[in-house]
Amino acid sequence: MKTIIALSYIFCLVFAQKLPGNDNSTATLCLGHHAVPNGTLVKTITNDQIEVTNATELVQSSSTGRICDSPHRILDGKNCTLIDALLGDPHCDGFQNEKWDLFVERSKAFSNCYPYDVPDYASLRSLVASSGTLEFINEGFNWTGVTQSGGSYTCKRGSVNSFFSRLNWLYESESKYPVLNVTMPNNGKFDKLYIWGVHHPSTDKEQTNLYVRASGRVTVSTKRSQQTVIPNIGSRPWVRGLSSRISIYWTIVKPGDILLINSIGNLIAPRGYFKIRTGKSSIMRSDAPIGICSSECITPNGSIPNDKPFQNVNKITYGACPRYVKQNTLKLATGMRNVPEKQTRGIFGAIAGFIENGWEGMVDGWYGFRHQNSEGTGQAADLKSTQAAVDQINGKLNRLIEKTNEKFHQIEKEFSEVEGRIQDLEKYVEDTKIDLWSYNAELLVALENQHTIDLTDSEMNKLFEKTRKQLRENAEDMGNGCFKIYHKCDNACIGSIRNGTYDHDVYRDEALNNRFQIKGVELKSGYKDWILWISFAISCFLLCVVLLGFIMWACQKGNIRCNICI
């Protein structure tokens, strides 16, 4: 019987303990941070997957599907390649003297004049594209003794046989083709680009009919360079009804230099020069439509925003563009470590601090306070610590963009078959650069994410230490991010703790008295629920055992009779 009384006393004593915050003479204050039900996984240096409350995607993986016409000046090549427009193919006459920032070549572009080849096509195309203009100046070359302005049925202007408008086809006059020696000085202050060519007849008869001599020769010289080309007579695959060809060459004449042209036949002469400008214009092959919009960055797939530091839309770009990487996604943490709030808090539903979990629903700040006191419960954000974290995180994205956005363009590389090894080397270099940047991007983002998480954890710890130093012995650290305050602390008192104006000395005596007046054993919150349930179960079990023993003893003494009927 004494055992029953003792256990009952313990049982009642345990349940009689006053819950934190329910006693008018105490209060509970917890510190916590923002949490969301479903966070975002990011990568850090130490963890491949860590959940944060918020993250920003750093890789632009889609385009607008169209090329914006602003702020760059876009010139749509339509049916013309840049070289056809340069030479003056009849169906490209509309491009004469045009200017551009980006010349867009279409896959449907075609040549519609005399068949030609350019031995150094890529260099000429790149040179003219970067110049950004087809401005042409005619010059008065003196071609005495030959017939000028030859034409062909394969190159019609309207219904008339014609030729490239920027070139002058010279052939025999009265069965004569004298030796040609023509000079043209550059008295300007800019570089001049001269385009000229050599005609390769398909037969010896065609050669003599046009140029009298059985073999021609063309030499073009400046003080710095000399090119000599001997025609190759012979049949070639038929193109637009012709098996003969023209080879296109080009010469740059510097200011103060002289252009010298010497020929005994087969010369396709220049009519003048193109002004060469130094600039950042370029060319791009694309079939994306040109639209009325604005974008600094253009790819063959279309324009893309440049508000992200990386993109994997296309390696070829023009303008201020994000750096190309292989990854489809790289997420930058812009929030703190996410620890979703527990839905239940034991049998008491008690509040808990940041050590155990975050708080959902705290929309006005990243860090804050929850309290229980005689006036009820409440929650408020700490704006100062929130702002300190936000200020440091906000600049991360802008800094990444500044580090990675290219202020130049990555143009297409073209090489002839003879330059195959150079092309392979160029491809290897470009692929290596992309691999390095992809690795660097992943490492950079992981470092920034690690710093963000460490930073936000640090701000939480700073706020906790600041609160602990204010309360001192007036409160006890409960070990879960909460303090049990041993004096009456109304909402005004709680507010003073939050804003840093709490006066420890005012409450010191009351707190000390309340500490000593607490009765019974105060169990730690982490084990209280378990101990209460275990105590209750043991008490019930022992009570049943004692009751059963009493019944059996009474039956033996005859004080109780038990009849079992079947």
From Swiss-Prot:
Keywords: Clathrin- and caveolin-independent endocytosis of virus by host, Clathrin-mediated endocytosis of virus by host, Disulfide bond, Fusion of virus membrane with host endosomal membrane, Fusion of virus membrane with host membrane, Glycoprotein, Hemagglutinin, Host cell membrane, Host membrane, Host-virus interaction, Lipoprotein, Membrane, Palmitate, Signal, Transmembrane, Transmembrane helix, Viral attachment to host cell, Viral envelope protein, Viral penetration into host cytoplasm, Virion, Virus endocytosis by host, Virus entry into host cell. Binds to sialic acid-containing receptors on the cell surface, bringing about the attachment of the virus particle to the cell. This attachment induces virion internalization either through clathrin-dependent endocytosis or through clathrin- and caveolin-independent pathway. Plays a major role in the determination of host range restriction and virulence. Class I viral fusion protein. Responsible for penetration of the virus into the cell cytoplasm by mediating the fusion of the membrane of the endocytosed virus particle with the endosomal membrane. A lipid is attached at residues 555, 562, 565 (S-palmitoyl cysteine). The keyword Acyltransferase does not apply. Residues 552-566 are cytoplasmic. The keyword Lipoprotein applies. Glycans are attached at residues 24, 38, 54, 79, 142, 181, 301, 499. The gene is HA. Disulfide bonds join 30-482, 68-293, 80-92, 113-155, 297-321, 489-493. It is found in: Virion membrane; Host apical cell membrane. The lineage of its organism: Viruses, Riboviria, Orthornavirae, Negarnaviricota, Polyploviricotina. It is a single-pass type I membrane protein. InterPro entries: Capsid_hemagglutn, Hemagglutn_HA1_a/b_dom_sf, Hemagglutn_influenz_A, Hemagglutn_influenz_A/B. It holds the Pfam family Hemagglutinin. The chain crosses the membrane at residues 531-551. Residues 1-16 form the signal peptide. Major glycoprotein, comprises over 80% of the envelope proteins present in virus particle. Homotrimer of disulfide-linked HA1-HA2. Belongs to the influenza viruses hemagglutinin family. This is Hemagglutinin. Residues 17-530 are extracellular. One of its GO terms (molecular function) is host cell surface receptor binding. Gene3D superfamilies: 3.90.20.10, 3.90.209.20. Palmitoylated. GO terms for biological process: clathrin-dependent endocytosis of virus by host cell; fusion of virus membrane with host endosome membrane; fusion of virus membrane with host plasma membrane; viral budding from plasma membrane; virion attachment to host cell.
